[in-house]
């Protein structure tokens, strides 16, 4: 008999995470590594677990993630977004809780490009009156 799996794709900055939820004991595997080996910050790990905590499904599913692009913060955000989307497949009743916490909305903030004539995206060179 085939095992039940739930899929979700999450994105944040330049990171894309493909998430699979499989009934299990709550392990989170990111790119074939345990999440504690892959993501160095405890705060980011807590952020990743947020959708599972809100829906009270923390120990019920193993989370298998394939993520690429960006840095640790962007990847953690993408994983969180993917888990939230996969949980909707598990039970559509979770939508209200996840939506209220803002976990279903794709965070569209990305780094603004540097413009010529300026030091950064908006920072102008120092102005000298004389």
UniProtKB/Swiss-Prot annotation:
NCBIfam families: PRK00132.1 (NF001099). The gene is rpsI. InterPro entries: Ribosomal_Su5_D2-typ_SF, Ribosomal_uS9, Ribosomal_uS9_bac/plastid, Ribosomal_uS9_CS, Ribsml_uS5_D2-typ_fold_subgr. Belongs to the universal ribosomal protein uS9 family. Signal peptide: none annotated. HAMAP family: Ribosomal_uS9_B. The keyword Ribonucleoprotein applies. This is Small ribosomal subunit protein uS9. The keyword Ribosomal protein applies.
């Amino acid at each position: 008999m085939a095992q039940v799996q739930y899929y979700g794709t999450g994105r944040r900055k330049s990171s894309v995470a493909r998430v699979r939820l499989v009934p299990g004991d709550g392990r989170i595997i990111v790119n074939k590594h345990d999440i504690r080996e892959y993501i160095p910050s405890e705060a980011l790990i807590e952020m990743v677990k947020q959708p599972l905590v809100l829906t009270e499904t923390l120990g019920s599913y193993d989370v298998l993630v394939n993520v690429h692009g960006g840095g640790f913060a962007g990847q953690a955000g993408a994983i969180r977004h993917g888990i939230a989307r996969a949980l909707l497949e598990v039970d559509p009743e979770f939508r209200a809780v996840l939506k209220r916490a803002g976990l279903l909305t794709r965070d569209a903030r990305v780094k603004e490009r540097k413009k010529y004539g300026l030091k950064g995206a908006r920072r102008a060179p120092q102005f000298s009156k004389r």
